[in-house]
Swiss-Prot record:
Removed propeptide positions: 1-2
Compartment(s) where it occurs, according to its Swiss-Prot or TrEMBL record: Plastid, Chloroplast
Note: The basic functional RuBisCO is composed of a large chain homodimer in a 'head-to-tail' conformation. In form I RuBisCO this homodimer is arranged in a barrel-like tetramer with the small subunits forming a tetrameric 'cap' on each end of the 'barrel'. NADPH and 6-phosphogluconate function as positive effectors to promote enzyme activation.
Binding site for Mg(2+): K201, D203, E204
Name assigned to this protein: Ribulose bisphosphate carboxylase large chain
PTM per Swiss-Prot/TrEMBL: The disulfide bond which can form between Cys-247 in the large chain dimeric partners within the hexadecamer appears to be associated with oxidative stress and protein turnover. The disulfide bond reported in 1WDD may be the result of oxidation during crystallization.
Matching SUPFAM superfamilies: RuBisCo, C-terminal domain, RuBisCO, large subunit, small (N-terminal) domain
N-acetylproline carried by residues: P3
């Protein structure tokens, strides 16, 4: 570099390290309708001011780095940088703050959850100046959400495909989850579907293992679907898990499912990855397959209250990436899930427009415009005594999934399915008659037992089963 060039380049540039807050903390900033907004729970290291911590998050998740660089002068940082525009302390917690960050839309590739997360929840989560960091919520502007296809079909299209209206759908995860042969697995599916369920399901870790290769499982499950449909006159389905070691293999399995004529496939969207999930969602839209999503690995990311990412963010990401169902906790079963918090992200999955509501953990108003909704799936440690609460909590647009609560029936799989179907129909009828499911639920179930011996046997076997543990991740008081 010539001396003259070096002198010119030095104008406006001062090498060294400066506080992030000088550039990235902008409390005067007014957010734009096109900004992606993020709410981070920040726990700074001792001696780090909250403004500096919030600014560091904005910087490290957008245009910043640890020192001033020459190439800052070759672009417009004011146009592209993230901005920490507001910080508030977390009530009841020492040294925790909610830092609000606005990101310009041009920082993100259109239609790519992968790119969005690589920026917003990338290296910044290992930043030494922060003791812990959690992404609590995102506001996705319509200008960005419209670049995504979203769910392959959505709630109304699924209802029309199944010709089932006015009640939650019923499912069952086949157990034991690992070890059955394909033929015995298919037999269990058939018995559950014939007994009254709408769906049966592969467990999340059923892929293509030595005891049951995927193609054999697909064939026997398809046989179970067609046989049970012929006997009941209802449309049935089985969530065939297409998750695989490569995207190419995953699509190959989905193609085979389509050739068999089954209505739905399944994907583990976190372990499989967002790129693979979006590819599968596009294939399902183009080929008339519904897509069930399992959230295996979510608790690694979302369970700790001060670090990671809340499930409401993962739920929004799934709606963008694509899925027609997703597991969303039960409130009453064996898996983590506080009621108001769970209903908050259930609404984010199903509804078109959701108002900001901090009482339910919703930090931003979210407008999905015309993106189809996702059906929440309640699954994990539930049985017939839970049916009134589940019907009241989740409403009609949900899947209530009883694995052990079907297959653990003392008389077998088909009676277990019948017990669940009778319990559901009784609860829906009682609700439609104006009865209070929360107050009269047990009485409704006991009355139905009088004309359903299958339900009576199920009620007897599970009458004392409860999962009474305090949730780890609770709303701030």
């Amino acid at each position: 570099m010539s001396p003259q060039t070096e002198t010119k380049a030095s104008v406006g540039f001062k090498a060294g390290v400066k506080d992030y807050k000088l550039t990235y903390y902008t409390p005067e900033y007014e957010t734009k309708d096109t900004d992606i907004l993020a709410a981070f729970r920040v726990t700074p290291q001792p001696g780090v001011p909250p403004e500096e911590a919030g600014a560091a998050v904005a910087a490290e998740s957008s245009t910043g780095t640890w020192t001033t660089v020459w190439t800052d002068g070759l672009t417009s940082l004011d146009r592209y940088k993230g901005r920490c525009y507001h910080i508030e302390p977390v009530v009841g917690e020492d040294n925790q703050y909610i830092a609000y960050v606005a990101y310009p839309l041009d920082l993100f590739e259109e239609g790519s959850v992968t790119n969005m997360f690589t920026s917003i929840v990338g290296n910044v989560f290992g930043f030494k100046a922060l003791r812990a960091l959690r992404l609590e919520d995102l506001r996705i502007p319509p200008t960005y959400s419209k670049t995504f296809q979203g769910p392959p079909h959505g709630i109304q299209v699924e209802r029309d495909k199944l010709n089932k209206y006015g009640r939650p759908l019923l499912g069952c995860t086949i157990k034991p989850k690992l070890g059955l042969s394909a033929k015995n697995y298919g037999r269990a599916c058939y018995e559950c579907l014939r007994g009254g369920l709408d769906f049966t399901k592969d467990d999340e870790n059923v892929n293509s293992q030595p005891f049951m290769r995927w193609r054999d499982r697909f064939v026997f499950c398809a046989e179970a679907i067609y046989k049970s449909q012929a006997e009941t006159g209802e449309i049935k389905g089985h969530y065939l898990n297409a998750t695989a070691g490569t995207c190419e293999e995953m699509i190959k399995r989905a193609v085979f499912a389509r050739e068999l004529g089954v209505p739905i496939v399944m994907h583990d969207y976190l372990t499989g990855g967002f790129t693979a999930n979006t590819s599968l969602a596009h294939y399902c839209r183009d080929n008339g397959l519904l897509l069930h999503i399992h959230r295996a690995m979510h608790a690694v990311i979302d369970r700790q209250k001060n670090h990671g990412m809340h499930f409401r963010v993962l739920a929004k990401a799934l709606r963008m990436s694509g899925g027609d169902h997703i597991h969303a906790g039960t409130v009453v079963g064996k898996l983590e899930g506080e009621r108001e918090m769970t209903l908050g992200f259930v609404d984010l999955l199903r509804d078109d427009f959701i108002e900001k509501d901090r009482a339910r953990g919703i930090f931003f108003t979210q407008d999905w415009v015309s993106m189809p909704g996702v059906i929440p799936v309640a699954s994990g440690g539930i049985h017939v005594w839970h049916m009134p609460a589940l019907t009241e909590i989740f409403g009609d647009d949900s899947v209530l999934q009883f694995g052990g609560g079907t297959l653990g029936h003392p008389w077998g799989n088909a009676p277990g399915a019948a017990a669940n179907r009778v319990a559901l129909e009784a609860c829906v009828q009682a609700r439609n008659e104006g009865r209070d499911l929360a107050r009269e639920g047990n009485e409704i179930i006991r009355s139905a037992c009088k004309w359903s011996p299958e339900l009576a046997a199920a009620c007897e076997i599970w009458k004392a089963i409860k999962f009474e543990f305090e949730p780890v991740d609770k709303l701030d008081s």
